[in-house]
Design a protein with these regions (language model features):
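Metallo-beta-lactamase
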Residues: 2, 77-124, 128-131, 237, ...
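Active-site metal-binding loops of divalent metal-dependent hydrolases
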Residues: 8-10, 38-41, 59, 80, ...
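Active-site metal-binding motif and surrounding structural segment of the metallo-beta-lactamase
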Residues: 34, 39-77, 152-156
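Short amphipathic alpha-helix with an adjacent loop that forms part of the alpha/beta core around
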Residues: 45-48, 102-106, 147-151
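Metal-dependent catalytic neighborhoods of phosphoester/phosphodiester hydrolases
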Residues: 65-73, 87, 207-218
């Protein structure tokens, strides 16, 4: 399995050479390419990426609105994400039911509801290929059922919006919304024994740190919260095999 990152920043003004594109990455296996999210400023790249299928975690612009240009590629998303994006010219929509596993190419994909936004709910993807299990969180405050989503996973692609300063707040309804910290996510990985993590979707603070400082900070947090977990920062253009040690 190979991962390629085409965009690694969130919906923030800050950008750098390493992080200028909104969220988009592919999972490639057995000649099949699954595109996970496709943010607004990635428009025009579909012809270059040439995915066989697309997964959308939720309908916020920095995750889904690269599809404003339209596509005939199958787009897998929750019912609410399809409803919110109904005006986008997506011609082949596949609805993901919570915790119901479906085949997408050679992979088995299960959508797990997460907490992120009241009007734009998010689902994480648990993707299985043989013995390898990858979990992509999308934007997240928490999983509704963390053990079901994370137990047995070997690789986690997580929300890098903030390292230690919480961006979680309460909606008028009392529901939590926003982004949890990398530190908190590493705590989950330590609890469930996930061996490797790659963070993407970086916010203002992580982008402004620069890559050497960001790498050091991630490693320090992993040592604290998930000893033995190998952690890395994604960057635009990064390509790596899941077997890579970097």
């Amino acid at each position: 399995m190979r991962l390629r990152f085409y965009g690694t920043k969130g919906f923030v003004e800050e950008r750098s050479r390493a992080h200028s594109g909104h969220s988009a990455f592919t999972i490639e296996a057995e000649g099949f390419r699954l595109l996970c999210d496709f943010g607004q400023n990635r428009k025009g790249l579909l012809a270059k990426i040439r995915p066989d299928a697309i997964f959308l975690s939720h309908a916020h612009p920095d995750h889904a609105w690269g599809l404003e240009e339209g596509t005939e590629i199958p787009v897998h998303a929750s019912a609410i994400t399809h409803e919110i994006t109904k005006d986008l010219p997506i011609r082949n929509r596949v609805t993901l039911e919570p915790e119901r596993t479906v085949s997408v190419g050679p992979c088995r994909l299960t959508a797990f509801p997460g907490i992120h936004a009241v009007r734009c709910p998010c689902v994480a993807a648990r993707i299985e290929l043989g013995d390898l299990v990858l979990v992509y969180s999308g934007d997240i405050v928490a999983f509704e059922r963390p053990e079901a989503a994370l137990a047995g996973a070997g690789l986690y692609v997580g929300d890098g919006s903030t390292l230690k300063g919480s961006l979680v707040r309460r909606h008028a309804t009392g529901a939590l919304m926003g982004h949890t910290t990398v530190r908190a996510q590493l705590g989950w990985l330590g609890k469930y024994g996930v061996a490797r993590a790659i963070f993407s979707h970086f916010g203002k603070g992580p982008i402004e740190m620069g890559e050497p400082a960001l790498k050091e900070a991630l490693e320090e947090l992993a040592t604290e919260k998930a000893p033995g977990c190998r952690v890395a920062a994604a960057r635009d253009g990064l390509s790596l095999a899941t077997e890579d040690s970097s």
